[in-house]
């Protein structure tokens, strides 16, 4: 039934293509010209930038912290990704066109002190990258639609960056869920940790983020962090924002103009992968360091690429937080997997490098991930750390930092307890293909499109168990807005194709799993161990292909543990969403609305 409905919609393609003339399919900067051979770019010639920092709070007389008010715009500007690459046209966040950067400025907020941000759209009438008019997408009469989501933020849905709350330059056009041009309010009443902000416009998220609309956001608690004594200060506590891009020889960003299934989707492809790895806006940069501890807050801001990160010389990462929440105890690893939109907060001690003068951060994850059995991924450099204790330009401040044996107290945050769940939901992940080919046409959650009526209505103050059934060949990083969750277990299905055939024949969502014998398909299936650094509270979790992942999802504040109400009305406004954070999937229906009730 779902396939028939989709094919019926595809009959409208000829009509929908007319929408391309409105927003524009992108000019020559988005797809014409000769693709750059990345081998012609010398690695490690650009220094890793520290993005501009903006204080998300004010300081009143007497040193009292008060709410901060920021105005951050979206601009079309030029950005140098590499010394030998011509400047690239991008969309970027900043306080002006001249100061806008890719990534955007790092917003530094204080726990419990609100940050108000007025987001302004100064983007041009046409997008410079191609987009697909056959997707459910924002398509105004003129201008580039944009809306900002604070990923990991605990905020009212009116400030959450709803995909249909987009707006163009000067608010000339707005989406159906747009309410007012007032500043977004971020209460910052959540644990200290790492967040990021990015575009979230309907059907254009992958394109706008590819163009450069992303940035880091921190929530700090000075008292808590002083007690932890982790590496601190701008020199020793750095954000690393990683993503991949392709370029043309003239420096332009490259995005495909023709899709894998052009008769269905003229431009959309299942995943975007670039051959150039970018860190903080520079291709394969370097960072000069001393032999001491550094804290690295590593965000994977790629559209679809997974990074499996390791350090040359066998250096360790010590994980102190995952996504937006500290772990209970530090977890040492030699390598770890980071999905799109995941954040790993790690400490690296370059004392362990011995006599080495350089350490390379590298990745060996296949693309797409996990790929076919037997695929061997190439190890690619990400950036280089140049160790020089004699460099007078580096801070000589002695290293008094440490990594404590315990990062949070047992009573600080709520403990995961499956017994508190008030109900069980089944969330099934589907990928549909064109008949006669293996090429995807769209991806659904619970066999429903984004525009179908809301089916998930959790109650504030409760927790739920979600069994996420991945019936596809891809690993999908699941993100739930507002909520935090813990992965309790992950089990392989014994016969994915049989279960998928049954469930698709029924045209059902996750609820049809029982009728199709889900437990029988799980019996004897492999149990996957959740990595230690991913056993805490998270807002993104990797759902392996052919598995059922059980999540305990918390629709209430994490701290204090007995909290039941958020500091705002969660039932008001446009509502929240949950989705796959592979942006190409999210833009093609792998996202569902969620309405929280009181």
Swiss-Prot record:
A molecular function (GO) term: oxidoreductase activity
Gene3D superfamilies: Cupredoxins - blue copper proteins
One of the record's GO cellular component terms: endoplasmic reticulum membrane
Binding-site residues for Cu cation 1, renumbered to this chain: 149, 479
Induction: Induced by potassium deficiency.
Residue sites binding Cu cation 3 per the record: 200, 481, 579
Annotated family: Belongs to the multicopper oxidase family.
Protein name: Multicopper oxidase LPR1 homolog 2
Name of the gene encoding the protein in the UniProt record: LPR2
